[in-house]
Every structure is written in C-alpha cells, then in structure tokens.
C-alpha cells in the first residue's frame, strides 16, 4: 500500500512523498486511495449536514425560547385568572357592602335630617316671633306717625283758619258798628231838616185841603233813624267758629281702637306659634331605611373567564404562528445554505489551487479557503484602497470582526434580540386584550352604581315625601295664620282709614274744609296705608316654607363620580395607592409588568452580548487605524524588499479570477531550510522539483507598491526560491466529489 512506508506512524496518516506530484502534466493529481475515500467531507456529505446550519439552529433556538415564553405567559395568565376571580369575588363583596351602605347610613342620615328640620323649625319659630313683633310695632308706629302727622297738620290748618275767621269777624263788627251810627246821625240830620220843611209844606197844603175836607199826613222818620243808629252785629256771630275751634278732634279714640285691633291678631298668632312650634319635634322614624342588597355579577357574568380564554387562545394562536413561521424559516434557511455549501465547495476547490502556487502567504491561503465569504468581503472592501498595506489592514479588520468566536457572539446576540422581538409581539398581542377586561370590570362598576342609584333614589323619594308633609303641615298651621293675620291687618288698616274719614265727615261735613282735608288725608295717610297693604299682601302671597329635598344621588354620587374621574386610583373598586382602576385588571397588569421586566432583562443581556461584539470589533478597528496611518518601515526596520527583488505577479488574474499575491522577495535558502526541516521529529512534505511557469523572479515595470505584504508570524518562516517548491496537498484537488 502507499501508506506502508516506514516511519509514518502519526495520525492522521499522510500520503507518501511524491505520489501527488504531477506526472508530466501540470496540475494533474493522482488519487491516493483506489476506493476514492478522502479524510475531508465531500459535497454530498456537506449537503447532508445543511439542516445543521447555524441559521436553522438559531431559529430553532429562538423557537424554543418563544415556546418557553408562551408557556410561561400561559402559566402566568392562568395564575392571573385565579387571582382575578378571587379579586372579582372580593370586588363583589365590596359591591355588596357598597349597595348595602344606604341601609347602614340611612339611620344616621335620617337623624341628621331630623336634626336639621328641628333646627330649622326652631329658627323659624324665633324668626316668626321676631317678625310678628317687629311688624306689629312697625305697623302701630306707622299708624301713629300717620295719624299724628295728619292730626298736627289738621290742627294747624283748622286752628289757623278759625283764628283768622274770628279775627276778621271782630274787625268787621267793630267797623260796622261805628260806621252805622255815624251814618245814622248824618242821615238823621238830613232827614230832620227835610222832615221840617216837608211838614211845613204839608201844613200849608193841609190848610188848603181843609177847605176841601181832606188833609195830607206829615212825615216822621226819626224812629227808623233811631233804629239805624242803634244797629250792631250780634255777638253770637263768632260762636260757631269758636265752636269749630273748640271741637277739633284729637283722634285718640280712633288710635286706641286701631291699636287694639292691630295688636289682637298679632297676639293671637304669637300664641298659636308658641303652641304649635314650641315643642315641635320631627319624627326621624318616619324617614325610610333601605333594605340591604346583594350583588352576583361574578356568577352571572362570564366576562373574566371569556377574557382569559381569549387571551389563552391568542397565546396558542401566536405559538402556532411562531412555530409555523420559524420552522418554515428554518427549513427555508437550508436552501440558501445548501446553495452556499455548493458554492463554497466549488470555491474551495478553485482556491485550493493557490496552495500549489508560489508567492502566496500560506496562512492567507488557508484563511481564504476556510472562510471564503468573510475573505471575499474583506477583499471586496480592500479593493477600494490602492495601497497594499491598507488593503491588508482592511481585510484584517474584517477577519478580526468575523472570526468564529466573534461571529458566535454576534449570532448569539442577534438570536437573543430576535427571541425578544418574538416575545414582545406575543406580549403585545396579550396586552391589547386588557381593555376588554377593563370594559368588563367597568360594567361591574356600572352595575354597582346602578344599584346604588336605584336604592338612593328610592330612599330619597320616600324621605322627600315625609319632608313635604312637614312643609304642608307648617304652611297650613303656621303660615296659614300668617296669611290670616296679614288679611286681618289689611282689614284693620281699612277700618282705620274708614274711621278717620268718618270723624272728618262728622266734624267738617258740609263745610268748605271737608274736601281739602280729605285730600290732605289721602296724601299723607291713604297712600302710605296702601303701600303697607301691598307689602302685607306680598307677605301673604310668599309666606310659605319649602325645606330642601334630598337629592336622588345622595348615596351614589361619590361612586358615580369615581367612574368619571381621570385619576384611576379614585375608583371605588381600587385600593388606596393602586395604579389601576380596579383589583381585577391590576392582577393582569402585574403579570404583564413582570413579563415586561423579564423581557427587558433579556433585551439588556442580548444588547450587552452585542456590545461585546461591537467592542471587540472596535478593538480591531482601532488597531488597524493605528497602523493605517503609520509610517512605512524601511528595509532595515523590517520593511519591504526592493522592487527589483519582487516576483512578477503577472499581467492579471488567472482563469479562476484570482490574482497572485507575492509573499516575500527574500533570497532562497532552500538547503538550510530543508536541513532544518529534516531535523524535526515529524516528517514534512518534500519539495517537488518542477519546471513550472513560475521559475524565477523577473523584474517588471508592473510591480507592487513598496510595502510589506503577506507576513503572518515569523519573518523568514517561509522561503521561496523562484520555483514551485511548495508541495500542494492532494486532498483538496480531486476531480470528483467525495464523501
């Protein structure tokens, strides 16, 4: 056998020297094993492990974490369901206590209402007594002011008129008496002369007349003149005026009568008020006491069970969706990975030719072959730079950031974030159903408020009927007397006016002073009395009491207001300090909050893992930047060789699209290298003598920049002497796919 050569006892077995060397044809390799077996995996073997690719495994891990999260959420929701049902029972008990609260509060409220009514009636009694006394004295004072004012004015007018009349009569009498006597004397003198002459004439005439048997009487008017001299006005002419002056009324009788009439109804009303309200006590037992109520909304309403059943259905549906999506994604991921394996296989076969070529860094070749994708990305990024050293640094940074360890950290972080995203979607779907539970609980609260409103309204209606009966009783028995008193007072004032007018009529009736005195009385007294009567009429119309009635929401206003409050902690279904409006949704929010906190921790952990990868990549970037802008070293400092010692890279890429990258231009020390190699305890590949196309280093005007390229490790680890003296491994160059 080919592997029977002595000294080949180490594992794995290596092919004998020279069997893979070309047999006259460049690049032709003879298979080692007749059955075609190779120690590395062929294409079909690689494809058989496609389902174990990293993406499929990561997706399955994400699926496992999502299933665990769904199971955890389901368990937590079941626990929350039990707590919610327990909370519903406690809320129901609280609702029972609240709807029964009017039963316990009614007695106290009834006593408070009775005390309020009693206090109001006591105050009303005092107010009525004071008002009656005040109105009584005010009316009497007003009447006195009116009639005394009128009496003074009346006395002034009458006495003045009578005094003026009497004085005038006396003056007229004196003038008349003196004037009449003087006139009488003068008339007597004139008439005496006339009488003498007339009598003389008559006597002569009688002398002649006697002849005829007749006679003419003589004139004698002295007696009438004497009467005229003795004429004087009678002293009784001023007796009537004096009688009027002495008979001016003082209205004492009218005032006494009026005052007695006014005081009588007031005294009677006071007596009735004292008798009616003196010992009045409102009967608190007449107010109703509501019966106790019981609520059963937890038993009749299946909202909580339906909510958690719906939440469980959402979790199961989401779990099925995630299983389908992630499993399909994991299966679909096998397709590009299979295609990638095929490309990787062919790329690796193509790039394995680099091993047989000289002027390549073996470590770079191994990296390119083993990591084709990251190496291709590095080469693509490095192609943007013309400087070979910078190209190498760019490729190094990408290789540093995409090393197996770094990629493991990166993929672990991405898988964690993807798992968190799936959990967040699942949790958000559950969280969106919480308003449904809040609506159900809101219905509970509204039911409690409705029962409270009905109980409160019924109690208020019954209590208001009792209060209205008290209003009617007081209005009939107390203010009815007030109405009677005001009517009697109006009648009294009318009597006062009529009596006064009667006195005036008796005194001045038929005289010139009667009409003026009536006008003065109407002006001074009548108009004022009319105003007082209008006021008394207004009092009579408005003299009634209306105690304030109890509102229908006496016992339900606070609970109803808590439902409309913007502060959720004010809800009557919440404990003091709760952030939610009720205990039931508080249980669900606690579960969701705990899951959110756990999810946040996972996000932080995944982010920290991603940050580790970022920090690692930054280390590589910083290191590359320090070298990126560094100064080039000369030959003595380990810099590149002179341009004329470089191998000719050729005019372009080969048939596979690769460009030879020169490793070094050091002179060959083949003998020393072989001597050192043979001194090692393990066998090593022998250099195959070949007359390949790359025989010697030829200077060309197409030369690489003067930079150090391709060293990985010791500077003189590899030596190339211008011929293809690197033995290529035949394990990567078989023409057919192997298992």
From Swiss-Prot:
Main localization category: membrane
Ranges for region Disordered: 636-693
Extracellular side: 1-49, 170-320, 419-598
Listed GO biological process terms: plasma membrane fusion involved in cytogamy
Keyword annotations of the record: Cell membrane, Conjugation, Glycoprotein, Membrane, Transmembrane, Transmembrane helix
Membrane topology summary: Multi-pass membrane protein
Protein name as it appears in the record: Plasma membrane fusion protein prm1
UniProt-annotated glycosylation sites, renumbered to this chain: 177, 220, 245, 256, 274, 279, 283, 454, 483, 490, 498, 505, 552, 564
Membrane side Cytoplasmic: residue ranges: 71-149, 342-395, 620-739
Gene Ontology annotations for the cellular component aspect, listed alphabetically: mating projection tip; plasma membrane
Designated gene of the protein: prm1
Domain of life per record: Eukaryota
Record field: transmembrane: 50-70, 150-169, 321-341, 396-418, 599-619
Family the UniProt entry places it in: Belongs to the PRM1 family.
